[in-house]
């Protein structure tokens, strides 16, 4: 462990969380914003549903830990909401069980300490045609209409147990041309979708009446910018200026600013998460479409009972 101890912000969920540190992902952006004020801790598990999350909840978030997180941002539901397969296999979790699982997750997290705050993210929408193009028959049983009730009921649960809820399902669909601009493979986020998620999270943190505030502009900066002349420049002001594009609708979008700064171009066509991961690791693509589960199993050299639908 390194010191001094900072507030901990934990991201807990499935592939939307695990891959949030890829190119300009929402987790990476939060880590950038909180780089001198808090630690962003990733606990993402691609392929998981809320049922799996419950199995490890007390291991990931033990009640007897000396240091408890200040904030936990939780995402599950995209896999739970897939269409059930006749075999009974696959990631589907019935809506009533999903809500009960999320209730248990929320109540456990709130019990960790008086200062632990919780945000639930709803399942996002998806581009069904893009999923078909990218994955072919490898992924079946996913649609916006299947996601909708999971998102709606999760928001109802948030109000019931006093957890902040963010309606990602609606927020992304309010973006112009969201079907073409928000997904790499019909399911996982582009930089544009991640920007939407970050702005929604910051909106909640800015408006919450939590004491202390966990909004990035409110947390104290760790150590002065210059020990020899600590008053010569305000690091806080410097950081606010650099990151103010998250608050102002009149400035260039985060995506455009990042692309210009890094002289990178967005892929000319949607690419699957598998393609992205294999390219990043200089590996070869198999000659046929592979599911995210297949990719994860190969990567970790583990065996799983055959699943008719891929998990995300």
UniProtKB/Swiss-Prot annotation:
Keywords from the UniProt entry? Glycoprotein, Hydrolase, Lipid degradation, Lipid metabolism, Secreted, Signal
- What's any one GO cellular component for it? extracellular region
The keyword Cytoplasm appears for this protein:
no
Keyword field contains ATP-binding: no
Q: Which residues are glycosylated?
A: 79
Pfam families assigned:
Lipase_GDSL (PF00657)
Look up the EC number in the record and give it: 3.1.1.-
List the signal peptide residues.
1-22
Enumerate the residue ranges of region (Disordered).
285-312
Compartments, as annotated in UniProt: Secreted
SUPFAM superfamilies associated with the record: SGNH hydrolase
Q: What class of enzyme is it?
A: hydrolase
Q: Which GO terms describe its molecular function?
A: hydrolase activity, acting on ester bonds
GO biological process terms, semicolon-separated: lipid catabolic process
Q: Which InterPro entries does its entry note?
A: GDSL (IPR001087), Iah1-like (IPR045136), SGNH_hydro_sf (IPR036514)
Give the UniProt family note. Answer: Belongs to the 'GDSL' lipolytic enzyme family.
Which protein, by its recorded name, is this? GDSL esterase/lipase At2g38180
Taxonomic source organism: Arabidopsis thaliana (Mouse-ear cress)
């Amino acid at each position: 462990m390194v010191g001094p101890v900072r507030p901990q912000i934990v991201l807990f969920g499935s592939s939307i969380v695990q891959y949030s540190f890829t190119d300009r992902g929402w987790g990476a952006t939060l880590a950038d914003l909180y780089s001198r004020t808090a630690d962003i801790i990733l606990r993402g598990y691609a392929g998981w549903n809320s049922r799996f999350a419950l199995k490890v909840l007390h291991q990931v978030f033990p009640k007897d830990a000396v240091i408890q997180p200040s904030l936990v941002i939780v995402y599950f539901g995209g896999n739970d909401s897939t269409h059930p397969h006749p075999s009974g296999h696959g990631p589907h979790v019935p809506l009533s069980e999903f809500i009960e699982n999320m209730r248990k997750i929320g109540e456990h997290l709130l019990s960790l300490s008086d200062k632990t705050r919780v945000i639930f993210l709803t399942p996002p929408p998806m581009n069904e045609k893009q999923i078909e193009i990218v994955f072919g028959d490898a992924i079946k049983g996913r649609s916006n209409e299947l996601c909708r009730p999971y998102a709606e009921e999760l928001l109802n649960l948030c109000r019931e147990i006093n957890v902040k809820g963010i309606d990602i399902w609606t927020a992304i669909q309010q973006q112009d041309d969201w079907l073409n601009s928000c997904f790499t493979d019909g399911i996982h986020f582009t930089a544009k979708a991640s920007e939407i998620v970050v702005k929604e999270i910051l909106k909640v943190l800015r408006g919450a009446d939590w004491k202390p505030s966990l909004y990035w502009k409110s947390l104290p900066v760790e150590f002065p910018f210059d020990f020899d002349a600590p008053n010569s420049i305000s690091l806080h002001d410097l950081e606010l200026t650099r990151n103010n594009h998250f608050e102002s609708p009149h400035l260039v979008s985060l995506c455009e600013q990042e692309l210009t700064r890094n002289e990178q171009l967005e892929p000319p066509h949607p690419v699957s998460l598998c393609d992205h991961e294999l390219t990043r690791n200089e590996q070869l693509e198999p000659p046929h479409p592979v599911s995210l589960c297949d990719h994860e199993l190969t990567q970790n050299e583990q065996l799983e009972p055959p699943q008719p639908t891929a998990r995300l």
